[in-house]
From Swiss-Prot:
Residues 19-23 are extracellular. One of its GO terms (cellular component) is plasma membrane. It is a single-pass type I membrane protein. Keywords: Cell membrane, Disulfide bond, IgE-binding protein, Immunity, Innate immunity, Membrane, Metal-binding, Phosphoprotein, Receptor, Signal, Transmembrane, Transmembrane helix. The gene is Fcer1g. This is High affinity immunoglobulin epsilon receptor subunit gamma. Pfam families: ITAM, TCR_zetazeta. Adapter protein containing an immunoreceptor tyrosine-based activation motif (ITAM) that transduces activation signals from various immunoreceptors. As a component of the high-affinity immunoglobulin E (IgE) receptor, mediates allergic inflammatory signaling in mast cells. As a constitutive component of interleukin-3 receptor complex, selectively mediates interleukin 4/IL4 production by basophils, priming T-cells toward effector T-helper 2 subset. Associates with pattern recognition receptors CLEC4D and CLEC4E to form a functional signaling complex in myeloid cells. GO terms for molecular function: identical protein binding; IgE binding; IgE receptor activity; IgG binding; metal ion binding; protein homodimerization activity. The modification Phosphothreonine is found at T78.
Length: 86
């Protein structure tokens, strides 16, 4: 009996408010659009900051080797063997 009353009340209900007011849908669409743009900008900013931090840390690591020079001589030198005169 209660389910029949609920069904009857649902049939009498007029259109849903969201379907009757398209302006509300447009406003919600604009809010979601702006939300997407803001999130995209924040994501790009974060990626750029991470990339800059990685470059800075790489340069900092390279600074350790700044004072070092490569050897001018080879570790192993070739011996010059002269043939004795005959």
């Amino acid at each position: 009996m209660i389910s029949a009353v609920i069904l009857f009340l649902l049939l009498l209900v007029e259109q849903a408010a969201a379907l009757g007011e398209p302006q509300l849908c447009y406003i919600l669409d604009a809010v979601l659009f702006l939300y997407g743009i803001v999130l995209t900008l924040l994501y790009c900013r974060l990626k750029i900051q991470v990339r800059k931090a990685a470059i800075a840390s790489r340069e900092k690591a390279d600074a350790v080797y700044t004072g070092l020079n490569t050897r001018s001589q080879e570790t192993y030198e070739t011996l010059k063997h002269e043939k004795p005169p005959q």
